[in-house]
From Swiss-Prot:
The protein's name: Lipoprotein-releasing system ATP-binding protein LolD
Record keywords: ATP-binding, Cell inner membrane, Cell membrane, Membrane, Nucleotide-binding, Translocase, Transport
Gene Ontology MF term list: ATP binding; ATP hydrolysis activity
Cited InterPro entries: AAA+_ATPase, ABC_transporter-like_ATP-bd, ABC_transporter-like_CS, LolD_lipo_ATP-bd, MacB-like_ATP-bd, P-loop_NTPase
CDD domains (UniProt xref): ABC_MJ0796_LolCDE_FtsE
UniProt binding sites for ATP: G42, S43, S44, G45, S46, G47, K48, S49
One Gene Ontology term from the biological process aspect of the record: lipoprotein localization to membrane
A cellular component term, taken from the record's GO annotations: plasma membrane
Entry membrane topology: Peripheral membrane protein
Pfam family, one: ABC_tran
Record's subcellular location: Cell inner membrane
Length: 238
């Protein structure tokens, strides 16, 4: 088994409003190994999205530690956290968050340009990735001209363009019909197998979650069960 890519220990998150405290995460411990496909399932309000924000250094835990590639995220400066987000962690959301006035190509190239890659190289890499996700014929189209499934494919391409070690996906198929959701799942697994990128997927879809390597069930701010998919099932699908 590969070395842990991400390790969380004792993650707590408490929101305070006046004298009232709300504990959203209650001591979460888990790890993701390189190249794993992991699902987090649970009802709304169980703490899934809050945890994802902490793992992506978009929010800070009240207590506990997050180590990503041996860096303790909460001890890094804001600039170093931003660099890790740009270069080593990709993000996909239920709502694609594509820039409406930019083409698919421009949206995918944006993280590269922000990271200092020149326009020619950024366009080349973005084009290659859009071809990989089956959108070579749509690279000049804006988000409003794409279907829901196509927009999510663009969002996944954007998340992967910097060749991150980890992609955090928050309900990436939540707005899609079942067939399109299955297509997106198959795309994530294909890209995982090709690039070795690990995926952590928050989802309400138990059927899709069961297809990933590991499923973590969250309830009331804690993980209550962990299910590891059998190696035989993984081999049969590969």
């Amino acid at each position: 088994m590969s070395n842990p890519l991400l390790v969380c220990q004792g993650i707590r998150k408490v929101y305070q409003e006046g004298a009232m405290e709300t504990e959203v995460l209650k001591g979460v411990d888990f790890q993701i190994n390189g190249s794993e496909l992991v699902a987090i399932v649970g009802s709304s309000g169980s703490g899934k999205s809050t945890l994802l924000h902490i793992l992506g250094a978009l929010d800070e835990p009240t207590a506990g530690t997050v180590h990503f590639q041996e860096n303790e995220l909460t001890k890094l400066s804001a600039n170093k956290q931003a660099k890790i987000r740009n270069q080593h962690i990709g993000f996909v959301y239920q709502f694609h968050h594509l820039l409406a006035d930019f083409s698919a190509l421009e949206n995918v190239a944006m993280p590269l340009l922000i990271g200092g890659v020149n326009k020619k190289e950024a366009a080349k890499r973005a084009t290659e990735l859009l071809e990989k996700v089956g959108l070579a014929h749509r690279i000049e189209h804006r988000p409003s001209e794409l279907s829901g499934g196509e927009r999510q494919r663009v969002a996944i391409a954007r998340a992967l363009v910097n060749k991150p070690a980890l992609v955090l996906a928050d309900e990436p198929t939540g707005n899609l019909d079942h067939k399109t959701a299955l297509d997106i799942y198959n795309l994530m697994r294909e890209l995982n197998q090709e690039s070795g990128t690990a995926f952590l997927v928050v989802t309400h879809d138990n059927e899709l979650a069961a297809k990933l390597d590991k499923q973590l069930s969250m309830q009331d701010g804690r993980f209550i069960t962990e299910t590891v998919r059998s190696s035989l099932a993984q081999e049969m699908e590969a």
